[in-house]
Amino acid sequence: MTTNYIFVTGGVVSSLGKGIAAASLAAILEARGLNVTIMKLDPYINVDPGTMSPIQHGEVFVTEDGAETDLDLGHYERFIRTKMSRRNNFTTGRIYSDVLRKERRGDYLGATVQVIPHITNAIKERVLEGGEGHDVVLVEIGGTVGDIESLPFLEAIRQMAVEIGREHTLFMHLTLVPYMAASGEVKTKPTQHSVKELLSIGIQPDILICRSDRAVPANERAKIALFCNVPEKAVISLKDVDSIYKIPGLLKSQGLDDYICKRFSLDCPEANLSEWEQVIFEEANPVSEVTIGMVGKYIELPDAYKSVIEALKHGGLKNRVSVNIKLIDSQDVETRGVEILKGLDAILVPGGFGYRGVEGMITTARFARENNIPYLGICLGMQVALIDYARHVANMENANSTEFVPDCKYPVVALITEWRDENGNVEVRSEKSDLGGTMRLGAQQCQLVDDSLVRQLYDAPTIVERHRHRYEVNNMLLKQIEDAGLRVAGRSGDDQLVEIIEVPNHPWFVACQFHPEFTSTPRDGHPLFAGFVKAASEFQKRQAK
């Protein structure tokens, strides 16, 4: 089987939506029965985004095998059935790290190590490795054409097109086609210059995706085709839409998938997008609306919580409920009090690191618990719920996490000192260990307690969810908290770690150490988020009586 590659680049400006466009195209090709995957090549020097600020970079998406990756991989998994892995995302930093390690070992036999061929060869090897076993691989190059950082990646894919053959490679370029209100027309010149930039490094785009706030007229698309040396049917208009799940249908309506299948000589049936049509229908026709407050530390950049926001929307789809998400800075809870939490139908506290804003999160968990407001805590959101319960119910005054107060009297959350690495080897770690790549990461098994709420929601005795944390519930102090009424609803597969807690005699209070948002999709949803949104709707109805 020959693997076909579609290389996706962007020009003119950043944040054009390459990831969404690539994922949408992959969804159409998958609907035609093809085995599809997507890769993201990031040009920054960090080895991975694990230690980057969420406010700068956005969310870190965790794959099943424990890779800390770009948030675009979350889009990929929400659009196609293929699960991402560490093979689907790598950075300049990772490539250089690998090449330098080989140089130190003497693998290059004394050669002068250079960008070409050593760096470009390493990039090509990883792309080919990631594409094994698939009919079509979409490879998204991060950044914008013209950036100095992305040049090695662009050179590598140029070489791949020559080596693999143009019959099995395609270049798809996204550009901005701005609308000028003064003249009442769209402008194609930025696109022409962007293509010129690509041509200067030896890449002729085969497909142009024209991003605009409105449909690009046929005459303007013809003009772009003429000046950019691209077939007119390969110039695609991608206007702004009110739902990203409409994009597969928008691309299909312009024959993009037919053009690609013909170019690759792929004989496959027409795409059936009925599942996406159902998602769009549910999204457009809710029967009610709820307001859910998300109290976090990084709310100034919503992309820091991208998967959580999408998972809440998916939970709404499963209940035919429109979810209005109110982003609340946890530090505002500290300074302004719980007044800003009133009027919400449910409260979610997501993950995070560091002490800033944590007391506001603890106050939030207490407010939800004492006022019977549905509460979902994720990662840090579980830890603050535990701290609240320890302080205010179990009489453990000033209980805290050793992450925030190392010498606190009641360290109910503490660092796990023994970890297993990606090869299953036990490693001993401490507060002085490296921050990067030293967490409990990836899919882990969790055993659910029979009479728990989560057991009903999942309808399964054992589940697998993804983790990203280095602190856990301190088992040494757990009995005192359980004696005060807190229920442990889920434990790790080896029964050593607390994974889920619930507050009995509360309508809906669930907190988990894992990240359920990473496995939620628009077509399937997720049991926790579906149950959470349903609880918010029921709470709203009770309040209205």
From Swiss-Prot:
UTP binds at S14, K187, T188, K189, P190, T191, Q192, K223. One of its GO terms (cellular component) is cytosol. Allosterically activated by GTP, when glutamine is the substrate; GTP has no effect on the reaction when ammonia is the substrate. The allosteric effector GTP functions by stabilizing the protein conformation that binds the tetrahedral intermediate(s) formed during glutamine hydrolysis. Inhibited by the product CTP, via allosteric rather than competitive inhibition. GO terms for biological process: 'de novo' CTP biosynthetic process; pyrimidine nucleobase biosynthetic process. Residues 1-266 are annotated as: Amidoligase domain. Its EC number is 6.3.4.2. Pathway: Pyrimidine metabolism; CTP biosynthesis via de novo pathway; CTP from UDP: step 2/2. The active site is at C379, H515, E517. Pfam families: CTP_synth_N, GATase. It comes from the Bacteria. Homotetramer. This is CTP synthase. It comes from Escherichia coli O127:H6 (strain E2348/69 / EPEC).
